[in-house]
Amino acid sequence: MKIFKCYFKHTLQQKVFILFLTLWLLSLLKLLNVRRLFPQKDIYLVEYSLSTSPFVRNRYTHVKDEVRYEVNCSGIYEQEPLEIGKSLEIRRRDIIDLEDDDVVAMTSDCDIYQTLRGYAQKLVSKEEKSFPIAYSLVVHKDAIMVERLIHAIYNQHNIYCIHYDRKAPDTFKVAMNNLAKCFSNIFIASKLEAVEYAHISRLQADLNCLSDLLKSSIQWKYVINLCGQDFPLKSNFELVSELKKLNGANMLETVKPPNSKLERFTYHHELRRVPYEYVKLPIRTNISKEAPPHNIQIFVGSAYFVLSQAFVKYIFNNSIVQDFFAWSKDTYSPDEHFWATLIRVPGIPGEISRSAQDVSDLQSKTRLVKWNYYEGFFYPSCTGSHLRSVCIYGAAELRWLIKDGHWFANKFDSKVDPILIKCLAEKLEEQQRDWITLPSEKLFMDRNLTTTS
């Protein structure tokens, strides 16, 4: 019996030791990031040149050149089966993009970073210089996606406000601060919110940026708000041309509320932690809300807008707007009715009459979102994947996205389809170059015709 107890004791000790050793080895392997040192063959590096360079934190040092999968973006645009097939093959691989600490590393030296990304080669026209645009970027994750978005919309004559969620990871915050330090026309919002989904804090984040942008010395004409999974569909030259056509009007979705959305602002909502979730959500109570102040008629739409500076100045100096904001604090997703309603308030700059027809998300060029229940009716099927009924676009949609006519689109994710983002950025740079060089070439031809005649 004594021998059995002794044997049992030693066996238990051995099991504990083996368990401890296994956990220690797993932690060590994770710390060393073995996947980067000895990657498997079926991977795809989204940023091959950077991921194998000394400019990032998590460097792939033993990657064979065969991992570098070349795709022709012109072929993707023309929907050539071979190139579309390549993009589908890449999606079957383990897609590895730069992590937040990689963005921190590559933006730690601003001169090197700007050279790596070719900011000095960005072309700008006289028309763009005289028509600066402001941006409000409300972000919380995936620093590399935000970095790509900023690179795509960057123009030295524009102004950019970044609002990052106070709850965001520290590494993400450092990456955003680094980006802002590298440019005189990019800054972090002076007041940062802890943003909760469908809560007033999301609207407040944009308002914080708008307030800061009004204090800027850059006299911007319009402001556009975006999130980290958005991407432009127009070059800056084309966007300036489109904004000029507005002639002081605003561009956003504004429709009469369907019955399914009435509860959002007719009942009091309280922010509560949802069971089995790691988030807080505004939960409807049985307490009815009073009618909106000043006989304001509610319209609904999107959280995203294109607003004139005159409109933005007005809302910060108008008591009706302030009262309406206070009334909206306990509603569900107030950012989806706040702007859509204000644009209908009589006397506001760029006003749309209450009796005017609805402006749907398809009519407003602000932002293209493909909902799965409208696919096949209003737009072709999604070739990527879906998240909460919203399409994350695939490479086969490149041509449609550019030709559709919207100015921005959502959602993009490099882990779903990195080729689409790469090719869209390439196409926008090509369009910017073509639009800027075209006038000079046309002028040259006109002069030649005049000389020969």
Curated annotation (Swiss-Prot):
Top EC class for this record? transferase
Gene Ontology molecular function terms on file = acetylglucosaminyltransferase activity; beta-1,3-galactosyl-O-glycosyl-glycoprotein beta-1,6-N-acetylglucosaminyltransferase activity; N-acetyllactosaminide beta-1,6-N-acetylglucosaminyltransferase activity
Keywords, A to Z, come to:
Disulfide bond, Glycoprotein, Glycosyltransferase, Golgi apparatus, Membrane, Signal-anchor, Transferase, Transmembrane, Transmembrane helix
Q: In this UniProt entry, which residues form the Cytoplasmic topological domain(s)? A: 1-13
Main site of residence? Golgi
Q: What is this protein called?
A: Beta-1,3-galactosyl-O-glycosyl-glycoprotein beta-1,6-N-acetylglucosaminyltransferase 4
Q: Where does the entry say this protein is expressed, by tissue?
A: Predominantly expressed in thymus. Weakly expressed in pancreas, peripheral blood leukocytes, placenta, small intestine and stomach. Barely detectable in liver, spleen, lung and lymph node.
What residue ranges are annotated as transmembrane?
14-34
This chain's function reads: Glycosyltransferase that mediates core 2 O-glycan branching, an important step in mucin-type biosynthesis. Does not have core 4 O-glycan or I-branching enzyme activity.
Q: Record's Gene Ontology CC terms?
A: Golgi membrane
In the UniProt record, the gene name given for this protein reads GCNT4
Where it sits in the cell: the answer is:
Golgi apparatus membrane
- Lumenal topological intervals: 35-453
Annotated GO biological processes are: carbohydrate metabolic process; inter-male aggressive behavior; kidney morphogenesis; neutrophil homeostasis; O-glycan processing; protein O-linked glycosylation; thyroid hormone metabolic process; tissue morphogenesis
